[in-house]
Design a protein with these regions (language model features):
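Bacterial N-terminal signal peptides that target proteins for export
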Residues: 1-10
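Bacterial N-terminal signal peptides
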Residues: 10-20
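Signal peptide processing junction and immediate N-terminal pro/mature segment
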Residues: 22-28, 610
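Beta-sheet-rich non-transmembrane sensory/scaffold domains
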Residues: 26-571
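C-terminal low-complexity, Ser/Thr- and acidic/Pro-rich disordered "stalk" regions positioned immediately N-terminal
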Residues: 559-606
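C-terminal membrane-anchoring or membrane-association module
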Residues: 610-635
Length: 635
């Protein structure tokens, strides 16, 4: 198969451009000079807390020029002065203590335009009802709280500011002794800066979808695992994860991640009016492949006889051509509570009482470590009707983002593009984990693991910013035409030369290690429009749960680039080459067809190991340890 190597910018050309030598690598792919839009990290706030979820969901408030950050490690909301994005500064916190019981956990937040902060708070015992907490963005004063459903995991304020909508996930107890009901709470907000009364809370349940109810649950909505709640087993099994509200503020769309479905909520009546399954992704089709092994020593993205369960975490809504479309980040998630474990490696099927792969399955001959053997798959799906063997394998997540109609029709899926982008941008750390730098550490699980997203409008273009939780970074797509999105750029404010977990485990100071490592584990993203930004240009803010950092990116559109801070040279460091851009495709296929990024990416199914070693040799010759174009952030 013809394998085309990406062009490399010569070291001499980099020197001619005057790029200073640097010590921390901020990946910019493709070369910024060839991108219509690039993300440039300009400032970071560090907590110094490693792998403690010290920076998760973020929200920017224009009137105060403040950024609000969920810090699950401290149980507080950190408040940053973001009036100078190059030097975000902690100026205070919002605490639930004194209003809610000790041990309550902050999970999510949203800020209304007038400064009403709304935070989703989980109870100290997670199977008890939680709360929405309200505060003033200017004074940081807590205004009050109302009780909502069990384990509110995400909250969103409607575009018109009238409602707060919380996804009450209601996970089982850690030992699976209790499995409470999932629900969605709809809270009518006061028009002024005040907490609503408890009477303003309405909760949409799933009771009508139970056996004997007025609605029938579609067959492909995944209901599985121990049935602990015998009164409302479907309601207990459904786990609302993330909420988006349409532009008219009339309908909420809620991901049911483990169930691989989306719930539709009518906000006027606070009722669930529809649940539609997302179906499954055929990884056996060209352009929809995956790299399933962390033990083959090569980047091998190819079609495989596996179905992917989309299982999105984040979801966003936008309008195009007079219609509303939904965008999902297809992370994937397996259930594991108490003695129940949903996942197993393919090579372990047939052991310890687990049914084997059916002998007539195409996967039966692919159980070696270099094939499908290492891939984690679901034990809840794919069994033959008699329970004797697995006739189909289902892996977790889509390793992609998707665009859907509001009726659940798939309009676009990025196929294997995200893995191919990462393979070309950071070949020596392809599918790395977040806590440590490695090669293919996550190929056997969910690959780059797209977790969340933000949608932003710049001029007449609409962009999706998709965070990759494991390898890190943000992928940008132009989604103005929902049927024909195109890849724009990828930025990763991470230095792979710093393996954070390894250094900290051997005595490294976490604060120092994390400053050098950069951003690990992007969890929350917020787009700041130019008219709201302190710089007058768009910004993107990311909360990174593993590094505990909050980073501000300048969103540079071609012709109006915002310069970043001056680079800081490191001892003996040398500049490294950047990778040339893939040209965005000109789609000609039907809307639901998956396409590769461009002709410059290696062909689907190609073994990329010769290319990877060639690329690695060039980078190592540059003295950079395999890192790409670098720009050091000032702390």
């Amino acid at each position: 198969m013809n394998l085309r190597l990406p062009a490399l910018t010569a070291l001499g050309c980099i020197a001619a451009l005057g790029l200073a030598s640097v010590s921390a690598a901020a990946v910019q792919f493709p070369d910024p000079a060839e991108s219509a839009l690039t993300l440039t990290p300009v400032g970071t706030h560090h907590t110094g807390q490693f792998d403690e979820s010290a920076a998760e969901i973020v929200a920017f408030h224009a009137a105060t020029q403040r950024t609000f950050v969920v810090n699950a490690q401290s149980g507080l909301i950190d408040v940053l002065d973001a009036s100078d994005p190059t030097a975000p500064t902690a100026i205070g916190t919002i605490a639930a203590g004194g209003t809610l019981p000790d041990g309550a956990v902050v999970n999510s937040l949203s800020v209304r335009a007038d400064g009403l902060v709304v935070a989703a708070i989980e109870a100290p015992t997670k199977t008890d009802p939680g709360w929405l907490l309200f505060a003033d963005a200017a004074t940081l004063t807590v205004l009050g709280a109302v009780q909502v459903g069990i384990q509110p995991d995400m909250v969103s304020v409607s575009p018109d500011g009238r409602l707060a909508v919380s996804a009450n996930e209601a996970e089982p107890a850690d030992d699976y002794s209790i499995d409470p009901e999932g629900s969605i709470s709809v809270v009518t907000l006061p028009s002024d800066l005040a907490a609503p009364a408890q009477a303003a809370v309405r909760t949409a349940t799933f009771h009508e979808w139970e056996a004997g109810g007025t609605r029938t649950l579609p067959e492909d909505v995944r209901i599985f695992g121990p049935e602990v709640n015998t009164a409302f087993p479907i309601s207990a099994n459904l786990e609302p994860e993330y909420v988006t509200v349409d532009a008219s503020s009339t309908t909420a769309y809620v991901t049911l991640q483990e169930n691989n479905a989306v719930a539709v909520v009518d906000l006027a009546s606070a009722t669930v009016t529809d649940i539609w399954p997302l179906g499954f992704k055929d990884h056996g089709q060209p352009g929809q492949g995956l790299d399933p092994s962390d033990r083959d020593g090569a980047i091998t993205i190819a079609p495989q006889p596996v179905l992917g369960v989309y299982q999105p975490d984040g979801i966003g809504a936008y309008d195009a051509g007079g219609q509303t479309y939904l965008v999902t980040a297809n992370e994937g998630d397996a259930r594991e509570w108490g003695d129940y474990t949903e996942d197993a490696r393919v090579k372990d099927l047939g052991d310890d009482g687990i049914p084997p792969i059916c002998a007539d399955s195409p996967a039966a001959a692919l159980t070696g470590d270099a094939d499908l053997g290492r891939l984690n798959v679901s034990l809840a799906d794919g069994l033959r009707a008699d329970g004797s063997c697995y006739e189909q394998l289902y892996s977790f997540g889509g390793r992609s983002f998707s665009i859907w109609t509001t009726e659940g029709t798939l309009v676009f899926d990025s196929g294997d593009e995200l893995e191919r982008i990462v393979a070309q941008a950071v070949p020596e750390f392809f599918n790395s984990n977040h806590s440590e730098s490695n090669f293919e550490g996550r190929s056997d699980d969910k690959g780059p693991e797209p977790e969340n997203l933000a949608i932003g409008q710049i001029g007449d273009r609409t962009y999706a910013f998709i965070g990759l939780e494991r390898v890190g970074g943000v992928v940008v797509y132009d989604i103005t035409d929902p049927q024909h999105p195109s890849f724009v750029s990828y930025a990763n404010n991470r230095d792979f030369a710093v393996s954070a977990e390894d250094e900290i485990d051997t005595g490294g100071d976490p604060a120092d290690v994390l400053r050098r490592a950069g951003d690990l584990g992007p969890e929350g993203l917020a787009f700041v429009a130019a008219e709201d930004s302190p710089t007058g240009e768009p910004l993107l803010v990311t909360g990174n749960e593993v590094s505990g950092s909050t980073t501000f990116f300048a969103v540079n559109v071609a012709g109006s680039e915002t310069p970043g801070p001056d680079p800081e040279p490191g001892p003996g460091a040398e500049p490294t080459p950047s990778v040339s851009a893939p040209t965005p495709p000109t789609p000609t296929e039907p809307a639901t067809t998956v396409r590769r990024v461009s002709g410059e990416l290696p062909d689907a199914g190609a073994d990329l190991s010769p290319w990877w070693f060639a690329m690695g040799g060039v980078l190592l010759a540059a003295g950079a340890g395999g890192t790409i174009l670098a720009r050091r952030l000032r702390s």
